[in-house]
A protein has these predicted regions:
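Noncatalytic, beta-rich nucleic-acid-contacting surfaces in large DNA/RNA-processing enzymes
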Residues: 1-312
């Protein structure tokens, strides 16, 4: 329709030539229809009983059973969609662990000390060749600057070292090194942002803010998290009102009713919007940080076994 309005020649052909008219009419009917069916790379649908009791199934690649609905429809129906991704690094860790046990029979990678100073010192010095997520030249430089001292620092580092959040790295490091300079808009914000030195790094922090400050439920806060990460403008306009002023019909008290003034509430919302565009899922980052730390531990204390497993 837009092309017909813009192009006079096309409009004339559409009006005067029967074949052109037919082709354009058919194109309008086809426009927007799914081109083909495909299967999610890692998504697995979980239900209480057999999935075909809830949704129609089809046969996908390699004879796998797939739903005929999209993942958004699946979630709207109340089914659980989980992403299960394979990670070769886990095989490296397993192989290294087997080799270490030849000389330390009771060695268990799941029982290593998560506060080992030697490991953090090695990471902070940038000696991270082979360490999961931390071995690129850019990440090495970041780790030298960050000087991680605990698992929280590694989790934050993995979350921040991505396009977008990287802009907030200087602020994060400044807050870590000079905690007295951090300003919190209210007491509740300090409680939530203290682990990340005043920066909103995780999606879970967005959820905590709307729950603690404005009285959102856990379910409603998750909807806000999704809307912010997907930049749904219309939803955000409505939720700003709910966040600041509350919504009695929907059971949201709002910031003002919780003792936070209008100006401060709006400032917090603006800050959330700014950070939430890039905020990372903490549970994902934490899982990656555990794998990173385990590879770092092996590299630090059992370099021969680790490198042999890595190169095999």
């Amino acid at each position: 329709d837009k092309a017909l309005k813009i192009s006079k020649d096309l409009r004339n052909a559409y009006e005067q030539d029967e074949e052109t008219h037919y082709l354009i009419d058919m194109s309008k009917r086809l426009e927007g229809l799914p081109r083909h069916a495909s299967m999610h790379a890692a998504g697995v649908v979980i239900g209480k009983t057999a999935i075909d009791e809830y949704v129609p199934l089809a046969t996908g690649a390699d004879n796998a059973a797939v739903t005929q609905f999209t993942m958004t429809t699946i979630e709207e129906l109340g089914l659980l969609k989980m992403d299960f991704l394979g990670l070769r690094t886990l095989t490296v860790i397993q192989d290294a662990e087997k080799m270490v046990r030849r000389k330390v029979p009771d060695f268990d990678i799941t029982k290593i000390d998560p506060t080992d100073k030697e490991v953090y010192e090695m990471i902070g010095n940038g000696h991270t060749e082979g360490v999961f997520q931390l071995e690129s030249s850019g990440m090495k430089s970041f780790m030298k600057e960050l000087k991680p001292q605990n698992m929280e620092d590694i989790i934050a580092g993995i979350s921040l070292y991505r396009p977008g959040p990287m802009d907030f790295i200087p602020r994060y490091i400044e807050g870590k090194n000079h905690q007295e300079s951090i300003h919190y808009e209210c007491e509740q914000m300090e409680e939530i942002l203290e682990p990340t030195y005043g920066c909103i790094v995780y999606q879970e922090q967005v959820m905590q803010i709307v729950m603690k400050l404005a009285g959102y439920t856990l379910g409603r806060s998750d909807l806000v998290r999704r809307a912010m990460s997907k930049k749904k403008g219309d939803v955000m306009i409505k939720e700003r009102q709910n966040f600041v002023y509350g919504n009695e019909e929907e059971g949201i008290p709002g910031c003002i009713n919780n003792g936070i003034d209008e100006k401060t509430a709006n400032q917090i919302w603006d800050e959330m919007l700014d950070f939430a565009k890039y905020a990372f899922n903490k549970s994902h980052a934490a899982a990656y940080a555990v794998v990173a730390y385990r590879t770092a531990y092996l590299r630090c204390h059992y370099p021969v076994e680790f490198m042999a497993a890595l190169l095999t």
